[in-house]
Regions:
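N-terminal beta1-alpha1 cap of cysteine-dependent amidohydrolase-like domains
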Residues: 1-118, 128-129, 136, 140-172, ...
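Active-site-proximal beta-strand elements of phosphoester/diester hydrolases
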Residues: 218-221
Length: 260
């Protein structure tokens, strides 16, 4: 059977937490990811593979990406502000430098090889910082409320306005505004070169960006995995991963942006 055929489900890598965790009698440092992430990929037609933080060297991220058709940078703790030249705000999480370095290497490698990827919440911030942008470390000081960070493990609901052009607007077509689930206290401040904003909140908070040089390189500030009835963004990633794999098998070249 042709392993490059369209009947083969795309393999999507998802980054994970690496935190102290409890299960049964055990209280250990462990890699984990809420099941809603890989459930969404499975329901969208992909195979989910988990990618816990690894020691980063010049080749390890590339070898991992060799085995993937697509990538998701998932939600989690704040990016270390040292990565964008700032001291930590009082509310900023203690740094997870292993995860920061791992996800930076993965997302940089994905962009270099045109591997379709999707950043979610922290994933949007990782992308912006990896490409040279900065973050607002405590959004309530900017917008004057905790509308995006209710706390207590409760997602807040916010309306975002979707742009007219781009991959995200194309996937969410006929949806000029969207009620989304939010859980973040940071946001993009200075947008990195090579990224385009494709969704915002009414207070100006950037809610979606795309990599200009890619056929499918998107990130959103909200948590689409929390809406099990709307798989459009996950289906878009799975479809792009399948198309990219088929293009590579047929021509040796990855999927290109429509304008390329």
């Amino acid at each position: 059977m042709d392993s490059s055929g369209s009947n083969q489900k795309p393999i999507i890598g998802l980054t994970t937490y690496l935190e102290q965790a409890q299960t049964g009698v055990w209280d250990v440092r462990a890699a984990f990811l809420p099941a809603v992430y890989f459930d969404a990929i499975n329901r969208a037609g992909g195979i989910a593979v988990l990618l816990p933080p690894q020691p980063v060297d010049s080749g390890i991220a590339s070898r991992v990406l060799d085995g993937l058709d697509g990538l998701i940078i998932t939600g989690g703790k704040d990016v270390d502000p040292a990565r964008y030249g700032q001291e930590p705000h009082a509310t900023t999480d203690d740094p997870r430098r292993d995860r920061d370095a791992w996800e930076d290497a993965l997302i940089t490698g994905a962009i270099d090889r045109q591997l379709p990827f999707f950043g979610i919440c922290r994933g949007l911030q990782v992308l912006n910082v990896a490409r040279g942008g900065t973050l607002n470390q405590h959004l309530p000081e900017i917008v004057g409320s905790t509308r995006y960070s209710a706390g207590g493990g409760t997602f807040s609901v916010n309306e975002v306005t979707i742009g007219e052009n781009g991959v995200v607007p194309g996937l969410l077509r006929d949806t000029p505004t969207l009620d989304v689930k939010s859980y973040h206290h940071q946001s993009i401040d200075r947008l990195a070169d090579g990224l385009t904003v494709t969704a915002r909140s009414d207070d100006g908070t950037i809610q979606a960006v795309e990599v200009d040089s890619m056929g499918f390189g998107i990130a959103v500030q909200w948590h689409p995995e929390q809406d099990g009835d709307d798989l459009r963004l996950f289906s878009g990633l799975v479809d792009a991963a399948r198309t990219n794999r088929e293009n590579l098998a047929r021509t040796g070249k990855p999927q290109q942006p429509e304008s390329a």
